[in-house]
Amino acid sequence: MAAIYGGVEGGGTRSEVLLVSEDGKILAEADGLSTNHWLIGTDKCVERINEMVNRAKRKAGVDPLVPLRSLGLSLSGGDQEDAGRILIEELRDRFPYLSESYLITTDAAGSIATATPDGGVVLISGTGSNCRLINPDGSESGCGGWGHMMGDEGSAYWIAHQAVKIVFDSIDNLEAAPHDIGYVKQAMFHYFQVPDRLGILTHLYRDFDKCRFAGFCRKIAEGAQQGDPLSRYIFRKAGEMLGRHIVAVLPEIDPVLFQGKIGLPILCVGSVWKSWELLKEGFLLALTQGREIQAQNFFSSFTLMKLRHSSALGGASLGARHIGHLLPMDYSANAIAFYSYTFS
């Protein structure tokens, strides 16, 4: 039977599996819930991966008892070697027919491998946030990715938290809100289905669910699109924080990445980028200021890109490469540019 390669995109909110033939054709897809082992634990993580892969195998007409040739896992929280090793051991021990070979990479590495063979910057803003630079020689550098207790700036969680905190601080008279809190306060009570601030505490502590809390970001986006000044302010600040992540990795970027016809390629991953127009002003401000402070004359332009396919495709490619097989990839079909900018 012809070899089949698998890839997993594992996010903090949802996950996806792709099965790919040895000539690069996508055979089947399956999706599921979060596979971030830091959030849900190793046991639940491997069970969800196994269930999704087997569902994809059945869709592709493949016997679930026939192992994949390789499975490349592009996981949120996939950059800790010891945790990755434990995850692979669990997959091998509990599900021996899942795959012959495994490779665990970060969600950023899977994303960039989907979009380009040459490297670039991946800027993730979904439930959480992260920025990873992959240079042409494969070396990596990064900023962020430390989770909601230490960062996640510019993410859906961060936007939701900023909104809630501004309301709390304003009512407490601790800090004046930059704009009227009326819309955000009512949206907060409605989203969490509570009558007052005390009701919010249950969602912050006893019943805290990062994905659920981050979902409040959608209400802030709706407010911003309707013209609410505070919602627009929060998104502008989120754009600024995301831009500062790019500024942080500028000194580590191989100059070759600045020299292509599209400038520095920045791959934007995560649902917050759907609100690019709300992020744009703060993002450009942070990049312009950071470029000037660092005197980064090489950095003259950039292009923002988004994936047309799941980063599971890049995961499959990296997993295949790990065992010596190069999957054919049509990079022009895998990613599309949505914004370009040249500094004056």
Swiss-Prot record:
The name under which this protein is listed is: N-acetyl-D-glucosamine kinase
Keywords, comma-separated and alphabetical: Acetylation, ATP-binding, Immunity, Innate immunity, Kinase, Nucleotide-binding, Phosphoprotein, Transferase
Which biological pathway?
Amino-sugar metabolism; N-acetylneuraminate degradation
Q: GO biological process annotations for this chain's record?
A: defense response to bacterium; innate immune response; N-acetylglucosamine catabolic process; N-acetylglucosamine metabolic process; N-acetylmannosamine metabolic process; N-acetylneuraminate catabolic process; positive regulation of nucleotide-binding oligomerization domain containing 2 signaling pathway; response to muramyl dipeptide
Which Gene Ontology terms of cellular component type are present?
Answer: cytosol; extracellular exosome
Phosphotyrosine: which positions carry it?
A: 205
Q: Name one GO molecular function term.
A: N-acetylglucosamine kinase activity
From the broadest rank down, the organism's phylogenetic lineage runs: Eukaryota, Metazoa, Chordata, Craniata, Vertebrata
Species this protein is from: Homo sapiens
Q: Provide the assembly information.
A: Homodimer.
Report the function annotation for this chain.
Converts endogenous N-acetylglucosamine (GlcNAc), a major component of complex carbohydrates, from lysosomal degradation or nutritional sources into GlcNAc 6-phosphate. Involved in the N-glycolylneuraminic acid (Neu5Gc) degradation pathway: although human is not able to catalyze formation of Neu5Gc due to the inactive CMAHP enzyme, Neu5Gc is present in food and must be degraded. Also has N-acetylmannosamine (ManNAc) kinase activity.
Catalytic activity reads: N-acetyl-D-glucosamine + ATP = N-acetyl-D-glucosamine 6-phosphate + ADP + H(+); aldehydo-N-acetyl-D-mannosamine + ATP = aldehydo-N-acetyl-D-mannosamine 6-phosphate + ADP + H(+); N-acetyl-D-muramoyl-L-alanyl-D-isoglutamine + ATP = 6-O-phospho-N-acetyl-D-muramoyl-L-alanyl-D-isoglutamine + ADP + H(+)
Q: Which family does it belong to?
A: Belongs to the eukaryotic-type N-acetylglucosamine kinase family.
Query: Which EC class is the enzyme in?
Result: transferase
Binding of N-acetyl-D-glucosamine occurs at 36, 107, 129-130, 145-147, 152
Record: residues binding ATP: 13, 127, 214, 271, 275
Which domain of life does this protein belong to? Eukaryota
Note one Pfam family from the annotation: BcrAD_BadFG
* Sites bearing Phosphoserine, chain numbering: 76
Tissue expr: Ubiquitous.
- Per the UniProt entry, the Enzyme Commission number(s) are 2.7.1.59, 2.7.1.-, 2.7.1.60
Kindly list the positions at which N-acetylalanine occurs in this protein: 2
